Amino acid sequence: MGSKNGGLFRWFVFALCSALFAALTSILAKVGIEGVNSTLATAIRTVVVLAMSWGMVFLTRAQGGMGEISRRSWLFLILSGLATGASWMCYYRALQLGRASQVVPIDKLSVVITLVLAFVFLHEPFTAKSMVGCALIAAGTLFMVL
């Protein structure tokens, strides 16, 4: 855990906060989606995320940087947005149909898939430690779900 962009372990604190909020999201979504069309629920959630995101952009005065974004970055940000939308639509439908205790672990298999994709497309290292970690996550997911 090294120092990068803002101090030692700062990224780690944000990652832990992300995990906490993701856990809250799952529980709140499971309760909130009851009796609501999953696509409508995703749209409502997206409006809230959109308002919060743009609020932070203006609060931090980051809107001036929009003109500096390259075409390549725009393309990949748009593709990422499409992938996020597809993920959320599938996630909400799965939560509506299944138990949070089963849906969430399967959703977190994204960690394994991300590591493999990062190795293949971003040429990031995939060490023996990474392989063991992926195998443990996959095995743990199967253990919790089956």
Q: Model-found features: residue ranges?
A:
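Hydrophobic residues within alpha-helical transmembrane segments
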Residues: 13, 17-20, 44-48, 75, ...
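Hydrophobic/small/kink-forming positions within alpha-helical transmembrane segments
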Residues: 19-23, 27, 54, 81-86, ...
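Juxtamembrane boundary at the C-terminal end of a transmembrane helix
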Residues: 96-97, 125, 141-146
